[in-house]
């Protein structure tokens, strides 16, 4: 039985289908969600089940702050303030916000996966080990700061390069074989991205 294309919601017949993200699409419906560029199965990024071209769209929308879209993995990291050294002890609430915090309740600590370093200079928490990430040891990916050794594939544990890996539900994965095996179309050939063995028409019926 023919499946429905997730882009146009129309029937996808065997001769016109491509498979990606575990779904069957019309060839020309597999487009970047942001710029509408036609994509190749296995040759694009994914976010919340939607396809995106790797650059510039995925890097611009979901990459770390300051990403250089001219080359994956090239980043301009924020420099620590020269006037305010990094705080290693308890966080102090700035004077300018004291009254505002009093009105809204007691101050809260930083989020474990804050996407940017807060303006007081205190380091963020690594989403992998839940420990503080200081400027000299951090890499930024998926909008979070990680220790360099902590940015690893969720499945195989391989160390990854910022901007050079896939993402699913906010977790990093190496493009192949792990992302292809877990989330790629059925029959993915992990030896070469974009090489697929499509399912034959299960009923062996001729095209309408």
Swiss-Prot record:
- Alphabetical keyword list: Acetylation, LIM domain, Metal-binding, Phosphoprotein, Repeat, Zinc
- Identify the residues that the record assigns to the LIM zinc-binding domain, covering every copy: 5-57, 126-178
Task: Note one Pfam family from the annotation.
Answer: LIM
Q: Which InterPro entries match?
A: Znf_LIM
Q: Does the keyword Protein biosynthesis apply?
A: no
* Alphabetized GO MF terms: metal ion binding
Residues annotated with N6-acetyllysine modification: 23, 138, 144
Q: Which residue intervals make up region (Disordered)?
A: 98-117
KW Repeat (keyword) present: yes
Which residue stretches does the UniProt record annotate as biased composition, category Low complexity?
104-115
Q: According to the UniProt record, list the residues that bear Phosphoserine.
A: 104
The UniProt subunit note reads as follows: Interacts with TGFB1I1.
Name of the protein: Cysteine-rich protein 2
Q: What is the lineage of its organism?
A: Eukaryota, Metazoa, Chordata, Craniata, Vertebrata
């Amino acid at each position: 039985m023919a499946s429905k294309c997730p882009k146009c919601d129309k029937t996808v017949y065997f001769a016109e289908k491509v498979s990606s993200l575990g779904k069957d699409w019309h060839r020309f419906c597999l487009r970047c969600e942001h710029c509408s560029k036609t994509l190749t199965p296995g040759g694009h990024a994914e976010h919340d089940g939607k396809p995106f071209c790797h650059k510039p769209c995925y890097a611009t929308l979901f990459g770390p702050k300051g990403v250089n879209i001219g080359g994956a993995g090239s980043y301009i990291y924020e420099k620590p303030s020269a006037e305010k050294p990094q705080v290693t002890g308890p966080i102090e609430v700035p004077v300018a916000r004291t009254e505002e915090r009093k009105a809204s309740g007691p101050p809260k600590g930083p989020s474990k996966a804050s996407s940017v370093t807060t303006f007081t200079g205190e380091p963020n928490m690594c989403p992998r080990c839940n420990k503080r990430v200081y400027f000299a040891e951090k890499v930024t990916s998926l909008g979070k700061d990680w220790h360099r050794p902590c940015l690893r594939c969720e499945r195989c544990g391989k160390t990854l390069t910022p901007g050079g890996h896939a993402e699913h539900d906010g977790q990093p994965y190496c493009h192949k074989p792990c992302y292809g095996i877990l989330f790629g179309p059925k029959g993915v050939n992990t030896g070469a991205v974009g090489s697929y063995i499509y399912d034959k028409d299960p009923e062996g019926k001729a095209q309408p």
